[in-house]
From Swiss-Prot:
GO biological process terms, semicolon-separated: alanyl-tRNA aminoacylation
Gene this protein is translated from: alaS
Localization in the cell: Cytoplasm
Organism of provenance: Mycobacterium sp. (strain JLS)
GO MF annotations, alphabetized: alanine-tRNA ligase activity; aminoacyl-tRNA deacylase activity; ATP binding; tRNA binding; zinc ion binding
Cofactor note: Binds 1 zinc ion per subunit.
Annotated keywords: Aminoacyl-tRNA synthetase, ATP-binding, Cytoplasm, Ligase, Metal-binding, Nucleotide-binding, Protein biosynthesis, RNA-binding, tRNA-binding, Zinc
Name used for this protein in its record: Alanine--tRNA ligase
Taxonomy of the source species: Bacteria, Bacillati, Actinomycetota, Actinomycetes, Mycobacteriales
Main location: cytoplasm
Catalytic activity: tRNA(Ala) + L-alanine + ATP = L-alanyl-tRNA(Ala) + AMP + diphosphate
UniProt-annotated binding residues for Zn(2+): 581, 585, 684, 688
Family: Belongs to the class-II aminoacyl-tRNA synthetase family.
Cofactors (names): Zn(2+)
Domain comment, as recorded: Consists of three domains; the N-terminal catalytic domain, the editing domain and the C-terminal C-Ala domain. The editing domain removes incorrectly charged amino acids, while the C-Ala domain, along with tRNA(Ala), serves as a bridge to cooperatively bring together the editing and aminoacylation centers thus stimulating deacylation of misacylated tRNAs.
Length: 897
């Protein structure tokens, strides 16, 4: 049975049983705790928690899922995959255990000609949670499953959660016995190679708290109602119904393996385990990469972007290790499209963008492979020259950090060079880097607060946001927090600058930071008996998307929980913020007009007077494109388009053409911001101007790369734009005055001066080298005898580069004849650098002298290092004070030889 038929039968089965078919959500959601969607129930979490009322009591879906913790195991075993499809049926307060078991058993065991999968009931097993006697009884009554094929298991196996705070509950898993050829009997408890799990029925009835692992967490209490969440692995069912041993042999991944085999000199399944691993890595990672790019992820250096980059680079590396030297990723994306397109049409409609981003990453990584390979060769040579047999952790870290080399690639290249790698040192450096990154992140954002301190308020008292309609609101203090701890009162006398003071209000006009718009600033003041209390608001964050937490500095008086206060947004701040946010929408619309619909938003930041917009695009914008984008934006500003917002159903908004951005999780009812009718239409929860003319002029400051396939546009708006233009006008006037030309002639005059300066520098370099060569002739005549070796060791004039020194060394070495000779030149370079070059002719090498050993004497004396080969080596240090000591150390080393 083909995979598309397996999917169809699943959905049809549950739709006929009164379930609403719900499309798969994106694999990326607006949840900082979840890197990727990893379960079918993720998009339904608000329904399970009772935060939103579901529009249906029964639902079914096939969710795209990504799990990457075991990425290094992919290919080594055939059980691990980074992408999988989870088919599920869900009940929100409707049927519970009996219905879930009945629906699953019917679909699995019904004959193929009756729309089932046709599994033999005698080969099916079930596991249940330790004390779930009810589930055991239902399996016997509903399915007729004998007690000997039902096993009890603990929390690690049969109690399900997402691994983070949220809904959870006991589960019952269904297994298929593949037969004695796959191992010993005894059920899932004895052998999970023979007994394969295909369906997990979760009886979602509790909410869990913080904790680690599969069982170390607190059960906070029951959910508002009992729910059902099930997950059937499409890939595993496909293996069984297609009669193959693993997912790589199914119609999902085998086409990718065959496409690679058609180009590789060594085939799949020909006896080489390492080659088969590479084939499987390519097949798995290509599919996952296509899905990620299709859902809006671009290669980057952290988070989701880093995962995508790592996947693609493992594909490229594996292909090269299979002997495929040509570009391969573009063809792989096409093969994935053909295999997965029937189930995921976006892989077809958005194929050009998916392929372009993947190919651009391949091109970039091929360059880093070339550069990194040279660094690896140097490091390997230096390691061997030092008599060591292990590449240092520092070298491995540099290859990873600078060139993007996976440690696996370094290990393989080292093995080919008969070297080991200091993996412990590498991991230590990686840990230090991660720790620095965490510390930096904490320093940048100290507003992170443990949710448990706010749980009572989150659940019972969500904040009402009034800021769309007013800037001043009467409110009541719901809670006061000092450094994350709830207190009844806080005052100016007790709150120091070192304390993090936060006020939670029942109503607030302050916009809480989200959607790229930074938070409002303003004041909170007391009323009545507390009218002396005043606090400056510097930041506002959302907790669980419903509670506004105001970061404040108490300037006078004291605030008491329950007091009535006046919350007032600074109107100038809000106006500037709305200019920036509306300007972001305008620039986004202009970008899409100029570049086309593939210029998809990847991030944004807007604050008073400034906006920053990241978008997916390959290659830098041309000057003409930049100019066009700026012109289209300002023409729309000048047109004074009306800006208005309205709420509507999500699907209706999408049908109107509203931009729904990748990775955002939207409710059923959404807010749409419209600027000038068709000019800009986006789903947005931010604040905006009333008409486009209020934005003022928009000046694009520049455009740059912020990662592979992601560009950034920055701009000033409003008064800040005017000030920027005024500064540029004053700068141009000053240049024109200094150059004594009209403003319009300044560029030509500056270009002429630059050319003259370049010519003068070139002539200066020529004269410096000529003088150095003349000095070199004298150096040959004055060569000193050190033992059996003629030595030319000189300090050269300042300003010489390593390239200049290599040229001179070549001249001198050629004039010294065939006797043993060593040439060593060192100079004072720019910025206190000290370049040096050492050459050893063949006769001196016969005496045991090596340039790459002698160069170490220079490096030690001038706080530097160097490397190279036996005949020629070079390096660089810091500090000219050590030059004489370096020359003396060299003489002493030669004399000892």
């Amino acid at each position: 049975m083909q995979t598309h038929e397996i999917r169809k039968r699943f959905l049809d089965h549950f739709v006929k049983a009164g379930h609403t078919e719900v499309p798969s959500a994106s694999v990326i959601l607006d949840d900082p705790n979840l890197l990727f969607v990893n379960a079918g129930m993720v998009q339904f979490v608000p329904f399970f928690l009772g935060q939103r009322t579901p529009p249906y009591q029964r639902a079914t879906s096939i969710q795209k899922c990504i799990r990457t913790p075991d990425i290094d195991e992919v290919g080594i075993t055939t059980r691990h995959n980074t992408f999988f499809q989870m088919a599920g049926n869900f009940s929100f307060g409707d049927y519970f255990k009996k219905g879930a078991i009945e629906f699953a058993w019917t679909l699995l065991t019904n004959p193929v000609d009756q729309s089932g999968y046709g599994f033999d009931p005698e080969k099916l097993w079930a596991t249940v949670y330790l004390d779930d006697d009810e589930a055991i009884q239902l399996w016997q009554e509903v399915a007729g499953l004998p007690l000997e094929r039902i096993q009890r298991r603990g929390m690690a196996d049969n109690y399900w959660s997402m691994g983070i705070p949220g809904p959870c509950g006991p589960s019952s898993e269904i297994y298929v016995d593949r037969g004695p050829e796959y191992g010993i009997e005894g059920g899932p408890e004895a052998n999970e190679d023979r007994y394969i799990e295909i369906w997990n029925l979760v009886f979602m009835q509790n909410e869990r708290g913080e904790g680690t692992g599969k069982s170390d967490f607190e059960i906070l209490g029951p959910l508002p109602r009992k729910n059902i969440d099930t997950g059937m692995g499409i890939e595993r069912v496909a293996c069984l119904l297609q009669g193959v041993d693993n997912v790589y042999e199914t119609d999902l991944l085998r086409p990718v393996i065959d496409a690679v085999a058609a180009r590789a000199p060594r085939g799949y399944g020909r006896g080489s385990h390492s080659d088969d691993v590479r084939y499987r890595i390519i097949a798995d990672h290509s599919r996952t990469a296509a899905i990620l790019i299709g859902d809006g992820v671009s290669p980057g250096n952290d988070g989701r972007g880093y995962v995508l980059r790592r996947l693609l680079r493992r594909v490229i590396r594996s292909a090269k290790l299979l002997g495929i030297d040509d570009a391969v990723v573009g063809d792989l994306m096409a093969t994935v499209r053909d295999a997965m397109g029937p189930s995921y049409p976006e892989l077809v409609t958005d194929f050009d963008r998916i392929q372009r981003i993947a190919v651009a990453e391949e091109t970039a990584f091929n360059r880093t492979l070339s550069s990194g390979s040279r660094l690896f060769e140097e490091a390997a040579q230096s390691t061997k020259a030092a008599g060591a047999d292990r590449l240092s952790g520092r070298d491995a870290f540099t290859l990873h950090d600078t060139y993007g080399f996976p440690i696996e690639l370094t290990l393989e290249m080292a093995a080919e060079a008969d070297l080991a790698v200091d993996e412990e040192g590498f991991r230590s450096l990686m840990a230090e880097q991660r720790q620095r990154a965490k510390a930096d992140a904490a320093a940048r954002k100290q507003a992170h607060t443990d949710l448990t301190a706010y749980r009572e308020l989150v659940d019972a008292h969500p904040t009402q946001f009034t800021g769309f309609d007013e800037l001043t609101t009467e409110a009541r203090i719901l809670g006061i927090f000092v450094d994350g701890r709830r207190v009844p009162v806080v005052g100016h006398d007790t709150a120091t600058a070192q304390h993090r003071i936060e006020l939670v209000l029942d109503r607030s006009p302050f916009y809480a930071e989200s959607g790229g718009q930074i938070a409002d600033e303003g004041t909170i003041t007391g009323t009545g008996a507390s009218q002396t209390a005043k606090a400056a608001v510097s930041d506002v964050q959302k907790i669980a998307k419903t509670l506004w937490v105001h970061r404040v500095t108490v300037e006078s008086g004291e605030f008491v929980e329950g007091d009535t206060v006046t919350a007032a947004v600074d109107p100038r701040w809000r106006h500037g913020a709305t200019q920036g946010h509306s300007g972001t929408h305008m620039v986004h619309a202009a970008l899409r007009q100029v570049l086309g619909p593939n210029a998809v938003q990847a991030g944004s930041l807007n604050r008073p007077g400034y906006l920053r917009f990241d978008f997916n695009w390959q290659g830098a914008l041309t000057d003409d494109q930049r100019t066009q984008i700026e012109e289209v934006t300002n023409e729309a500003v000048e047109a004074d388009f009306e800006v208005h917002s309205f709420t509507t159903e999500l699907e209706k908004a999408k049908s109107m053409g509203a931009m729904a951005l990748f990775g955002e999780a939207y409710p059923d009812e959404v807010r749409v911001v419209e600027i000038g009718g068709p000019f800009s239409l986006e789903l947005c929860g931010g604040t905006h101007v009333r008409s486009s003319a209020q934005i003022g002029p928009v000046t694009i400051l520049g455009e740059s790369s912020v990662g592979s396939g992601v560009r950034r546009v920055e701009a000033y708006v409003g008064l800040d734009s005017f000030r920027h233009l005024a500064k540029e006008r004053a700068l141009m006037a000053g240049l024109a005055s200094s150059l004594k030309v009209p403003s319009e002639e300044v560029p030509a005059r500056v270009a002429g001066l630059v050319e003259r300066l370049k010519a003068a520098e070139k002539e200066l370099d020529r004269m410096r080298l000529a003088n150095a060569r003349a000095a070199a002739v004298n150096a040959v005549a004055g060569a000193e005898r050190v033992g059996k070796v003629r030595l030319v060791a000189q300090r050269m004039a300042g300003g010489m580069s390593a390239g200049d020194l290599r040229t001179l060394v070549g001249d001198i070495r050629g004039k010294l004849g065939g006797d043993p000779a060593v040439v060593a030149l060192i100079a004072e370079g720019d910025n206190d650098t000290v370049p040096f070059v050492v050459a050893v002719n063949p006769a001196a090498q016969d005496l045991g002298l090596r340039a790459n050993e002698l160069v170490k004497q220079f490096g030690a004396a001038v706080n530097g290092r160097g490397g190279g080969k036996a005949d020629l080596a070079q390096g660089s240090g810091k500090g000219a004070a050590g030059i004489d000591a370096a020359l003396a150390a060299l003489r002493a080393e030669i004399d000892r030889s």
